[in-house]
Amino acid sequence: DLNGVNAFQMALHKTDDGRYYMYCGSFRGPGWNVVDVTDPTQPKVVNWLEACDPKEYPATNTPKIQVADGLMIGATGGGVSFLHGCKPGDKSLGSLQIFDIKTDPVHPKLLGKWETGVENGMGVHRFFYNGGRYVHLSADCPGYTGNIYRILDIIDPTHPVEVGRWWVPCQFTDGLKEGEYPVDGPQHWEFMDWPQLHGPPFVVGNLAYLSYYCEGLIILDISDITRPKKIGQLQLKGPFSGKFAGARTHTCLPLPGRNFLVATNEGERFPFYNKEILTTGPRKGAQPMNNLHMIDISDPTDPQLVAEFPYPEVPENYPWPNFNTAGMDGAQGPFGPHNIHEPMSNKPWLDQNPNRVYCCYFHAGMRVYDVSDPYYIKELAYFIPPNPEKLLFDIPVPGPMLA
């Protein structure tokens, strides 16, 4: 049961002798599980690594993780009360930690650590590492509100150094008057409509593709790694995303070897909602659509939306007529996608098919799409797991326990 800790992002590593290990970040937990999945029908937990002292940093989570070039790189950061059960005043550690897994994949050795500089902040969220010298982060930063784009040089993994950063101008709080920007943002819904990088910053060649909440897709030229420059943008919010939804633009994934990119708006977790919540207050009523979008990036200075992904097929035996109102007694919830599979060129053990998109929805399971024709997208298959019986940490659950 993964030591009683629910996994979040997972990274697969293939050893030189053909074994497979899954390194699991934690949605609510201060460390990483190491799972031997060489026999995928018999996964076995073989180690647990702690990122910090949980007594000193009780609010720390390890949500995101990357593996490449014999390194495991894990992110740490804080949580929010309604998602993670963190209590006011709980301390958290915002960092990136680098481990050697080539020498001993079961017992990763800590090589170096880098801290964001923000005390008890959100820390590092999604990030990109395809091997090599640089790690591309979505992370908080002193003097800014919300996560910005930060670039680390890890040529010496024992001493990571920040070498570049980029942000939307209104994130630079030292340039604004107090009251012009959200304070303690992650605890307040208005922060969801403030520019910030969700990530990961997906890098192909000298271009970085950023999923920037209400700012949509932003494309940067990073040929000078120390001075990223904006060259293109496509906003998606309005008509897409808003109100009770999650990250307004969650992921922007270029399809391998193609001039197309898939962007997503994040839905939200239905267990945290019910009819009363959805029909009262300033965010009540019809919820904007959250979806997967196909974007033409053949001209990075002029990205254009060219197609929408189809609504997930509803199983014949599903207890509700659709996923938007599932378990909500007729009210509409913020249904939509969450994570998509991220193929990377330096990770050949991952599926690299440029004509497939794998997406996990909130309570609609994993969906597999054929995108060989970018204008006529077809759903090929789906898997919806059983609903959970309980949560592994203490938070209010006013809505239905849906997977």
Mark where each language-model region is.
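Feature marking well-ordered beta-strand scaffolds used for ligand recognition
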Residues: 1-403
